[in-house]
Amino acid sequence: VKILIVEFITGGGLAAEKAPESLAREGDMMLQALLAELNALKGLECAVMLDWRYQNNISEQTLTKIIVQENENFYQVLARTLPDYDVFWPIAPETDHALAEMVRLSAEIGVKCAASCLSAIDLCSDKLATMNVLKSVLPVPETRNLTVFTPEFPSAWVVKPIDGAGCEQTILVSDRQSYRQCLAEIDRPEAFIAQRYVAGKAISLSVLFKAGQAWLLCCNEQQIKIDDNHFVLMGCRVNSAIDHLASYHNVIDAIARSIPGLWGYVGIDLIEIPDRTHTGKHQLRVLEINPRLTTSYAGIQAATGINVAEQVLQLFDGEPDMTRLRNETVTLKL
């Protein structure tokens, strides 16, 4: 089986412009982990597309490398490369419809794609639309488009791109001065949302989905700091938070039913807060759904022994084997 792996940032999606360093680091971390897992499997012939600046990031001799030069159009290179492969595995942010465009292209060319269906990707690429779908089945923070947002202080709010990835342009607004500073940074308010700030533990769920079913790989604790009102992802503790497994399963089952087009690996960001009325209990708020590999993925095999790539490919023909070989916490630093 010939498989083409393309991570958007390091794979040439921004070949003609400066790539954001934080997203390039995260992208490279996910790409290296995916290639290592695929390399451990028999019967696969792997190729990877690489931005001309990142072509030396991959040292694996058995891989085919397709280099995207500075003057080349990323989607044209992808379109002429895809027909040579049986399976396409995109890793891309939802930003500017990058993930959707890559999946759409593979569908047009007729190459099997290790990703959610386009309708699910389009929905999850719009954080406001996602919250509107989920709010009838799960607790979510109040979310509004920035164009119709009137700040109500002393409540704090988080302003972020409607299609953002990572912590890019994610800003805490807690008073009128910080709100004015926030607006001064933003070119297109219609492309941003304001979400009521929920103080608590930032966690993410790593999940496999298929046809309305969900399998929990692990729960992770995200290490986020706020620097000059900007959120910064410092790293994550993979397979760390296992206090509330039943609640996590309820969340992923509700999401699977609400968005049955989710397929393969998906990351779900939540905030976990203590329940003040019940000692020892907690509440969850779902913040967003990322229909793609997330940074936490890079530590899952070390933490659990599960080869996630193998189980995703297994989804084409059946169900994944979630048997753990170990149960450890792995810390990833960014």
Regions found by a protein language model. Name each.
Residues 18-38:
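Short catalytic helix/loop segments, enriched in acidic residues and glycine
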Residues 87, 277-280, 310-334:
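Peripheral (often C-terminal) accessory segments that flank ATP-dependent C-N-forming ligase machineries
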Residues 1-4:
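Extreme N-terminal starter segment of soluble prokaryotic enzymes
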Residues 48-144:
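Conserved N-proximal alpha/beta basic substrate-recognition cap immediately N-terminal to
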Residues 118-202, 209-214, 235-249:
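Active-site nucleotide/adenylate-binding loops and adjacent lid/helix of ATP-dependent enzymes
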Residues 11-17:
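Short N-terminal binding/cap micro-motifs at the start of the first secondary-structure element
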Residues 196-261, 272, 276, 290-316, ...:
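ATP-dependent carboxylate/phosphate-activation module, predominantly the ATP-grasp catalytic core
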Residues 281-285:
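Conserved protein kinase catalytic/activation segment
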